[in-house]
Amino acid sequence: ISAKLLGRINGAIAKGAETHEVRTEEEFADFVHLLKAHNYFKPKRFIPDATFFRKVVESGCGKLLITTYNDTTIGCCAYAVSKGNAYLWYAAYLRKSYLRLYPAEVTVWNAIKTAYEEGCQHFCFLDVGLPYRANKLRDFILGYGGKPVSAFRWFRCRYKWLNRILTHVWSF
């Protein structure tokens, strides 16, 4: 992690942003609402129902984290744990509304720290964005010292007819 990124994270924490596990039903509702609202206009992302997240947490295979500022949820993420590795599954942030608090950076960094404290050896990002040259999400992930390991991209859309078209287009 770069010194600039760490400075942003420490500055946001000093301003009052804090990340913790989802504890109450109200926080769980805020988590689901932010996740669905963040991905509403992104047809390539499938967001499961709230019962899915509840069952993952109850089984002990995953964690739900939220970042709050003045009792407002500004970031959330869900990660799964398996065989000593943590996998960032879903994440959503209010980047534009809380620009100077860097909710994406704070949420992901605290998820990495939480996974490390639980004994996870690796932290993997499952969604690395679309396979285009200029990709802000991929650059964001690489800012944490990660390295890309995938050689191709598999598309999955929530609309079956669009899924068939994309599969046909990308098979050439």
Predicted regions located by residue number:
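Alpha-helical elements of Rossmann-like donor-binding domains used by nucleotide-donor carbohydrate transfer enzymes
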Residues: 30, 34, 51-52, 106-110, ...
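Conserved acetyl-CoA-binding loop-helix of GNAT-fold acetyltransferases
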Residues: 99-113
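Active-site/acyl-donor-binding loops of N-acyltransferases
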Residues: 120-172
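A conserved beta-strand-loop-helix scaffold within acyl/acetyltransferase catalytic domains
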Residues: 1-100
